[in-house]
């Protein structure tokens, strides 16, 4: 209802009477007045204006120094280098450069973009479903290929696998613990300012939108902002996934918390593998790298089985019979002990790539039929993970607790094997045209912007839905993809470019 109904207690009675008693109203949510500007509003906007001013001045001075030939004279000065961290032309070149370290894993940028688009489609579909006709969203589960969207939760595991792979790859490539500690500091200093400042942006500017989406049933931006005002410090410490999904600040931030928590425990496995390799060289015993990874995976599987059995949990957050199971989200979906399977698989992939490149492990190129067989197996695993839940999602079959627990375990293992094979095949030259496509330089800028795109896309979904003059109306999954997901992805990368130039890259250079 519009703001004029804020204090009108007769609205419910009037609507009941005009429908001749046929309408039963559970609740009436009034849009209410726009939130008053607080001291934090002015404080935060002062920070943003200051950053914009510094970037503007730095860009002008960069242009002046380049045109006047002063660059060589100034580049050795610390103050100049700090100021140039905010130069928009330089940061733009850093983002859109198609040059990359030859030792880098070039297929990852494309995989990041594909996974991000899949995640964005998941969120867009969920949020439009939280409108005036959620039953239509549930009916979509009757179509077999709808599982491409309805079971796109696996795309998140791709990000965890990539995170584990990059941590492992950089660690074993450098093979020095001290350098790993320095990289940890760099990671925190590069990611955290962009993250926390965007939380501030969300707190300040979301109430200014305050459209129909501010009073959604589940995805309620008003309550999310209130959560952020009281629990933002948990986001800063990367422990916000302790809160439930309803009480959490900025709905997609749980991923960053879990990713950082897995990053904190990664040294346990990295150091164990590293020192076991060192001892094996000195004392000539076989390194048990795979066994170390399998122990971690087994413990994660045990946690999934226990939680699923004890709390009688489903295998997905949304099904036809259970449109929103927050217990599953809070106990399994947002917790590191269930997400470490793809992360550990990524650590194993990173270790293997480094060892093969350094010729510590010698891999002979498999025969063509073996490579084709591996691709078939990987594709079969990925398709099985996505589509095997078809009957379960649409409510046509009830899975036993054992079946649900096994799917929760082996779906993550199967997906990790499939994605891990794609990365290894592209790296070792076993992917043919697939590697040519995934490793194309045009993917590099999109990969560099994927972090900030992930930060901005959730806010942009709220922005676009709040810009409408009525509640969200779900038509179909493909309709939502074309009318909301595509615009959100496009605008997310525009927003990511701005946020990366203004915050992420400058603070990374300053560190």
Predicted features by range, described:
Residues 1-110, 115, 122-156, 160-163, ...:
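Exoplasmic/lumenal regions adjacent to the first transmembrane segment
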Residues 122-127, 163-172, 202, 262-277, ...:
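Membrane-interfacial alpha-helical segments at the cytosolic side of multi-pass membrane proteins
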Residues 53, 60, 117, 196, ...:
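Generic alpha-helical transmembrane segments of integral inner-membrane proteins
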Residues 50-54, 114-122, 190-205, 295-303, ...:
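Hydrophobic alpha-helical membrane-insertion segments
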Residues 57-113, 169-193, 264-296, 348-380, ...:
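Helix-loop boundary elements of multi-pass alpha-helical membrane proteins
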Residues 1, 175, 230-254, 265-416, ...:
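Aromatic-enriched alpha-helical transmembrane segments of multi-pass intramembrane proteins
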């Amino acid at each position: 209802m519009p703001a004029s109904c804020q204090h009108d207690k007769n609205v419910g009675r009037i609507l009941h009477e005009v429908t001749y008693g046929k309408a039963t109203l559970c609740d009436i949510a009034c849009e209410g007045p726009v939130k008053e500007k607080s001291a934090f509003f002015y404080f935060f906007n002062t920070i943003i204006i200051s950053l914009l001013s510094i970037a503007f001045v730095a860009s002008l001075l960069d242009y002046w120094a380049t045109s006047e030939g002063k660059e060589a004279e100034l580049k050795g000065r610390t103050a100049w280098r700090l100021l140039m961290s905010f130069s928009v032309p330089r940061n733009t070149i850093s983002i859109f450069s198609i040059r990359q370290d030859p030792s880098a894993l070039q297929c990852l940028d494309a995989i990041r973009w594909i996974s991000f688009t899949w995640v964005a489609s998941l969120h867009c579909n969920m949020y439009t479903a939280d409108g005036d006709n959620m039953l239509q969203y549930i009916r979509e589960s009757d179509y077999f290929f709808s599982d491409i969207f309805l079971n796109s939760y696996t795309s998140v595991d791709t990000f965890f696998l990539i995170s584990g792979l990059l941590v492992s790859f950089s660690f074993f490539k450098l093979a020095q613990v001290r350098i790993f500690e320095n990289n940890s500091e760099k990671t925190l200093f590069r990611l955290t300012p962009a993250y926390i400042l965007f939380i501030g942006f969300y707190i300040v500017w979301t109430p200014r939108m305050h459209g129909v989406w501010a009073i959604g049933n589940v995805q309620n931006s008003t309550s999310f902002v209130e959560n952020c005002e009281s629990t933002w410090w948990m986001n800063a410490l990367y422990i916000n996934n302790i809160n439930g999904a309803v009480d959490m600040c900025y709905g997609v931030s749980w991923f960053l918390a879990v990713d950082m928590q897995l990053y904190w425990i990664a040294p346990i496995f990295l150091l164990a593998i590293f020192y076991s390799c060192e001892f094996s060289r000195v004392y000539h015993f076989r390194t048990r790298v795979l066994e170390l990874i399998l122990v971690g995976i087994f413990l994660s599987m045990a946690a999934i089985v226990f939680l699923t059995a004890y709390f009688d949990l489903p295998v997905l957050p949304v099904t036809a019979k259970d449109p929103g199971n927050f217990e599953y989200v809070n106990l399994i979906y947002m917790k590191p002990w269930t997400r470490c399977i793809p992360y550990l698989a990524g650590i194993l992939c990173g270790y293997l790539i480094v060892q093969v490149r350094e010729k510590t492990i010698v891999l002979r190129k498999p025969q063509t039929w073996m490579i084709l067989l591996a691709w078939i197996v990987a594709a079969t695993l990925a398709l099985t993970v996505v589509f095997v839940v078809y009957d379960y999602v649409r409510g046509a079959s009830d899975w036993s607790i054992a079946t649900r627990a096994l799917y929760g375990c082996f779906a993550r293992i199967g997906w990790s094997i499939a994605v891990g094979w794609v990365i290894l095949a592209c790296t070792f030259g076993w992917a043919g045209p697939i590697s040519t496509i995934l490793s194309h330089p045009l993917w590099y800028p999109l990969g560099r912007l994927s972090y900030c795109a992930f930060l901005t896309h959730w806010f942009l979904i709220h922005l676009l839905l709040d810009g409408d003059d009525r509640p969200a109306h779900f038509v179909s999954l493909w309709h939502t993809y074309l009318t909301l997901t595509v615009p959100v992805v496009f605008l997310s990368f525009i927003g990511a470019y701005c946020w990366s130039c203004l915050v992420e890259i400058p603070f990374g250079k300053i560190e």
